[in-house]
Amino acid sequence: MHEPLVRNGTSVRGWLRVTLALICGLSIWTATQARADGMETLMVPSAAMGRDIPVAFQAGGPHSVLLLDAFNAAPDVSNWVTAGHALSSLAGKGVSIVAPAGGAYSLYTDWEGDGGKQWETFLTSELPDWLTANKGLAPHGNAVVGASQGGTAALTLAAFHPDRFRYAGSLSGFLTPAATTMNGAIAAGMAQYGGVDTQTMWGPVQLGRWNRHDPAVHVQLLVANDTRLWIYSPSTLTCSDPAAMIGYCDQAQGSNRDFYHRYRNDMGGNNAHFDLPVGGQHDWGSWGPQLAAMSADLTATIR
């Protein structure tokens, strides 16, 4: 019997074993990475806006969390994914993650004078119906959570679409947009940072259509629907990320405190968590951890 060829004290058979082990190890590592990083980028068609919308998606269960971005939303990948660590915060919690991109300076509403911004229609009709048909998600009883402009929209969408959303979270949202000081700040900030005219959005303030999109005006709907709320807004007056808050961080907590009083004192609401701390920032350094903090409350509500 011939001995196998040996070089430097290692047989060819030994080299083969080592090589196969490395290949198997690499295959296992790659498979593990594929399982751990389960995000997909979906291109969801919107007939209302006449284009496909990029949506980050991580499957986790039949019910989902819709994540809405701050004013300076990225065009291709939601800041909830890149800065808010949403995928890791909600991984393994039994819920799916849905995070659309491209909603910068839109307040996620249907703009009266801009057909390319029909976000309420997309978020409450086109997107959930598409996810039900293509990903098997439940069309009703889900959560919506937003930062900054996304927080404003989250409460408004939940108020008017309670079948879609039983849970709503607002982090540094402007919750009294129809108030005189607040609507002036929104109009000025969106013009400065986004180059948009809010009269194209909801028309002139004096015509009253801003009221329809004001969570504080419709707080009675949230109470009547028994929507579970999570509200966070620090008292910080300065902006660490001005574009995310259109430069008006000093308006955020006052708006949230007004909403709190209307919810608790005027309407007797008792299905909400309020966190209005002295410390913290209106940025992803606070919003990301808040999503993690609310995750148990959120999943207990929608699962």
Where do the model's predicted regions map?
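Secretory targeting and sorting signals
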Residues: 1-36
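Non-catalytic cap/lid and distal C-terminal segments of serine-dependent acyl enzymes
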Residues: 34-303
